[in-house]
Amino acid sequence: MARNVVVIGTQWGDEGKGKIVDWLTDRATGVVRFQGGHNAGHTLVVGGEKTVLHLIPSGILRENVTCYIGNGVVLSPGALLEEVDMLEQAGVDVSGRLRISETCPLILPYHIAVDGARELAKGMEKIGTTGRGIGPAYEDKVARRAIRLQDLFRPERLACKLKEVLDYHNFLLKNYYHAATVDYHQVLDDCQIKAERIRPMVADVPKLLFEASQADNNLLFEGAQGALLDIDHGTYPFVTSSNCIAGAASVGSGVGPQMLNYVLGITKAYTTRVGSGPFPTELSDATGEHLAQRGNEFGSTTGRPRRCGWFDAVAARRSIQINGVSGLCITKLDVLDGLETLRIGVGYKSKQSGEMYDALPFGADDLAAAEPVYEELPGWQERTAGIRNFDQLPQAAQNYLKRMEEVCQTPISMISTGPDRTETIVFHHPFG
């Protein structure tokens, strides 16, 4: 009986999803990306070799796995081919195992130009995007003016649609942002060149996924970013431009929701955030520096330092609720090694009224007006990195994990104690 698993981040991204997806693909025949674009950064370590993927699903490093990019992904042809070349130079067969939905909206140079001009214009109020054109590409999709992957293979349609959409964006760039415009012929020529390399990988992804599931093949749906960055349920407006929650796996790939059997929520043992936006448990002291240095907390896509803080159970519970999380995978436990005392944010208190509440507010302003209520637990000095058996963890680490489980009101299925595939403790395998 086929079992399909959705892997999502329960925080603000960077939870370590790439390593877990790579580990889970041992029992999957297909891995599906269903939202986001090359703003994601999934880091995999196999046999000591580090690979960072931004667009192609993490299952590509398993020879028996077919990878799919669903319609919910905004696709940069240039970023795609750069990643294909990088992997194939390393001996990985990509073009023979990657299938891309023809209805993916494209990210083209004018999206990147608008993204950069917009952030520059906002100054101190900027969102902190990756500058890769993700937001403007999703805007075109919703406005029904997007150029989709299928358009690359219809030259007359491509030329006409590109002229129309580029006139619109160049008007904005020139007259509103006072920025340089984008050349039509250069974009058109580049699209036509890249089209022939991409054509063999284009497929009817919903049909292939349905057939794979009907044939009792396990599928893994790989989320990007994290639930707290979701365009609807995140800390708006400091969010990404797509739906990052588990429900998006259905919409963004073309499979029915009844085909999704298990949701694995990836959660760091502490909390991080990149870019702007409220972060109640953020630490600006020596402990925050410890987390940043030990956790190597620098964005794999932008290289920006991540903001670090204590584990926020209130935010985690909201993510668990909106995703219907079946089980948690706790990552980066080893980063807490050496800390005398640990804290978990178990509630919020209004900075103005002192009112207590235990649910994540909707919207950035309300969250910024909250301060965390902490519960303290003893830390541990022993090393947890690489441990593969729960009973071998220090007692204080075991107690910390049990408390995380209690305050999240969700069972822990897995624990990651290091970046390599093998550095994993498993209580319940999502594929059964």
From Swiss-Prot:
Its cofactor is Mg(2+). It catalyses: IMP + L-aspartate + GTP = N(6)-(1,2-dicarboxyethyl)-AMP + GDP + phosphate + 2 H(+). SMART domains: Adenylsucc_synt. The keyword Magnesium applies. GO terms for molecular function: adenylosuccinate synthase activity; GTP binding; magnesium ion binding. The keyword Cytoplasm applies. InterPro entries: Adenylosuccin_syn_GTP-bd, Adenylosuccin_syn_Lys_AS, Adenylosuccinate_synth_dom1, Adenylosuccinate_synth_dom2, Adenylosuccinate_synth_dom3, Adenylosuccinate_synthetase, P-loop_NTPase. GO terms for biological process: 'de novo' AMP biosynthetic process; IMP metabolic process. Mg(2+) binds at residues 14, 41. Signal peptide: none annotated. Its EC number is 6.3.4.4. GO terms for cellular component: cytoplasm. GTP binds at residues 13-19, 41-43, 306, 332-334, 416-418. Belongs to the adenylosuccinate synthetase family. PANTHER family: ADENYLOSUCCINATE SYNTHETASE. Plays an important role in the de novo pathway of purine nucleotide biosynthesis. Catalyzes the first committed step in the biosynthesis of AMP from IMP. This is Adenylosuccinate synthetase. It comes from Nitrosomonas europaea (strain ATCC 19718 / CIP 103999 / KCTC 2705 / NBRC 14298).
